[in-house]
From Swiss-Prot:
Keywords: Metal-binding, Oxidoreductase, Zinc. The gene is msrB. GO terms for molecular function: peptide-methionine (R)-S-oxide reductase activity; zinc ion binding. GO terms for cellular component: cytoplasm. GO terms for biological process: protein repair; response to oxidative stress. HAMAP family: MsrB (MF_01400). This is Peptide methionine sulfoxide reductase MsrB. The lineage of its organism: Bacteria, Pseudomonadati, Pseudomonadota, Betaproteobacteria, Burkholderiales. Residues 9-131 form the MsrB domain. It catalyses: L-methionyl-[protein] + [thioredoxin]-disulfide + H2O = L-methionyl-(R)-S-oxide-[protein] + [thioredoxin]-dithiol.
Amino acid sequence: MTEKVIKTDAEWRAMLDDEEYDVTRHAATEAPFSGRYWDHHEHGIYTCVCCNTPLFASDAKFDSGCGWPSYFTALNPDNVKEKIDRAYGMIRTEVICNVCDAHLGHVFNDGPPPTGLRYCINSASLRFDATPDLNES
């Protein structure tokens, strides 16, 4: 596994915009249908906004209709971790970057095949790295 990224609160505040900071460091949730990647269709890799760890591939992205980017699998399961989230009187499974502990979103058991999972991820927790389409001439 990649070495843990640990920063002070002041360092996180200096490198992230307000929404990125609130989402990743304080588990806030951006409004649905508002994030830059909920309706994004380019080919590439979505990385952690805090530490650049590769998290999700565009090939695993699907339109769940929920207003947040949704993926049926993580790019590398070792790069994300899950924990029980009991906030707001609900029991959900929170998804966190395993390298820097950034809050990413939640995972639900209502996704498509082949996994049946829906990683519902805040755009504010992600950066996108485009990769060339190998099928193009």
